[in-house]
């Protein structure tokens, strides 16, 4: 297992330190199109090291005809900065389209050099959509909790009546009374699961080592449903403990890993699940009920190389009864989203064929003065 923290970097200058403190990718492009400087956020965005970025031409990182190339030429010609919003920016390395806001400006001290800052919109947009869904779901959850009690009472009567009939029924009719009892039990089980969504009691929390949780989930998976799947771990050992309920975190990641295992079940020896943790400073958003913006510095990911989630399901993937499985109830991911939300965090999914990522961003972190203590893996 390796992490970015284990690689030694040269001591940055003041200017480099300021650039690396920015949460958004920043590039400095020379007149010939080469990237001569990049910050650490650019390393994460393009999924290659800054040392490699500094040897590349920008044309090798973005598709032919990319609007970014045209904007750079426009700024170089006019000498004036340009902002462009909601630009689809794909890269040959990571594939697909990533929607970003582009801020392009000339560097007056170095003629012909252009500064490019990219601000990715997908995470922010998904967070806003998830918070909107969470707020709208509260009324539905309240209705479900009220109906749960009203549904159980008549079901109990129906089941009791079926049992009485069963005592005097013929063998053929007993099959029908047993069917009535089984279906009543199935509805009660479904109602019980729905009642979980109406549970708004405070979550009992304490310091939790996230790597211990992930290791526990991995062992459970490898001894059962993911016995033939190859696991890859990429952990940041410097992460602080999470202020959370350990049992609920295990439930979250066990559900995500089980979904990933089902997604790669037909890949045989190529089946792969990756577990990653990272510290992402600068991710902040406003949450209903809180006056200040909340910091979400911890990132925990479950990735798989399965066929991916259908694009039309992605926006509503964490809503109840949304599922890609013929026999699924569609409540697993909805419960995961509820638990993460109860902890003050956000969960999102990015998916394309051979690369699906479930990302949990956590808001409740135990901070220890100015440093982040190391914890064992």
From Swiss-Prot:
Key words, A-Z: ATP-binding, Cytoplasm, Hydrolase, Kinase, Nitrogen fixation, Nucleotide-binding, Phosphoprotein, Transferase, Two-component regulatory system
Organism: Bradyrhizobium sp. (strain RP501 Parasponia)
Positions of post-translational Phosphohistidine modification: 149
Histidine kinase domain: residues covered: 146-366
Protein name: Sensory histidine kinase/phosphatase NtrB
Stated role: Member of the two-component regulatory system NtrB/NtrC, which controls expression of the nitrogen-regulated (ntr) genes in response to nitrogen limitation. Under conditions of nitrogen limitation, NtrB autophosphorylates and transfers the phosphoryl group to NtrC. In the presence of nitrogen, acts as a phosphatase that dephosphorylates and inactivates NtrC.
Modification note: Autophosphorylated.
A GO molecular-function annotation: ATP binding
Coiled coil location: none
């Amino acid at each position: 297992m390796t992490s970015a923290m284990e690689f030694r970097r040269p001591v940055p200058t003041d200017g480099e330190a300021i650039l690396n403190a920015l949460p958004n990718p920043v590039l400095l492009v020379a007149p010939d199109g080469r990237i001569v400087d990049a910050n650490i956020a650019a390393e994460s965005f393009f999924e290659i090291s800054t040392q490699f970025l500094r040897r590349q031409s920008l044309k090798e990182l973005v598709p032919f005809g990319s609007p970014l190339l045209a904007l750079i030429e426009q700024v170089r010609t006019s000498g004036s900065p340009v902002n462009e919003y909601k630009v689809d920016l794909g890269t040959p390395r990571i594939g697909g389209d990533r929607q970003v806001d582009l801020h392009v400006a000339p560097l007056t001290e170095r003629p012909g050099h252009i500064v490019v800052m990219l601000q990715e919109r997908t995470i922010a947009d998904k967070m806003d959509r998830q918070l909107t869904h969470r707020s709208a779901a509260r009324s539905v959850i309240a209705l479900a909790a009220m109906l749960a009690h009203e549904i159980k009472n008549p079901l109990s009567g129906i089941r009791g009546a079926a049992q009485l009939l069963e005592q005097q029924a013929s063998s053929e009719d007993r099959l029908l009374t047993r069917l009535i009892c089984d279906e009543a039990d199935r509805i009660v089980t479904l109602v019980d699961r729905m009642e979980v969504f109406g549970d708004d009691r405070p979550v009992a929390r304490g310091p939790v080592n996230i790597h211990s949780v992930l290791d526990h989930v991995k062992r459970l998976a490898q001894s059962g449903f993911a016995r033939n799947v190859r696991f890859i771990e990429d952990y940041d050992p410097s992460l602080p403990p999470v202020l959370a309920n350990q049992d609920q975190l295990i439930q979250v990641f066990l559900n995500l890993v089980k979904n990933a295992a089902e997604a790669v079940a037909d890949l045989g020896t190529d089946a792969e699940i990756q577990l990653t943790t990272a510290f992402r400073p600068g991710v902040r958003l406003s949450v209903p009920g809180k006056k200040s913006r909340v910091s979400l510095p911890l990132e925990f990911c479950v990735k798989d190389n399965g066929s991916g989630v259908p694009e039309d399901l992605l926006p509503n993937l964490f809503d109840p009864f949304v599922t890609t499985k013929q026999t699924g109830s569609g409540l697993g991911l909805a419960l995961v989203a509820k638990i993460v939300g109860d902890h003050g965090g956000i969960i999102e999914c990015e998916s394309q064929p051979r690369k699906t990522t479930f990302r949990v961003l956590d808001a409740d972190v135990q901070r220890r003065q100015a440093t982040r203590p190391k914890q064992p893996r």
